């Protein structure tokens, strides 16, 4: 997006002066009362809208303006890489926290205006990050590298058994509580 090449991480003077807000991209603006346009509600682009107010009444700020008013210095975004349990092109009422990773570092399609176009996902994700940076807010991405949604992941199809911790019986170790765990020690 325009200005991306000049964008940079927002550095804090002192970590003791930080105010961190954890949020879920869809929850941030999904409700109609958020004042975000219908096209951008629950999407990356919701973060690019300024001047949003509760029910559009002009009294109580919402979304990015609300974060600025609170003095939030950092947002920690729940996982927004490609996750399995939401049909990206399906019913918009589907919800997941994002802790069921499929493709690490690929922006989740359900948060984009066009889940079928990888370029759109990337551009809109970058626009969200840039809008937060432009507001003086640092961005932290919550990541889950200790497991994948399925044992039949791209890792296992590439090099079977290598990327996962296995018991001597060839069954998957389940230290993550999700049916498998990546072998981060390799």
Locate predicted features.
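An acidic, Gly/Ser/Thr/Pro-rich helix-cap/linker signature
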Residues: 1-19, 29-38, 57
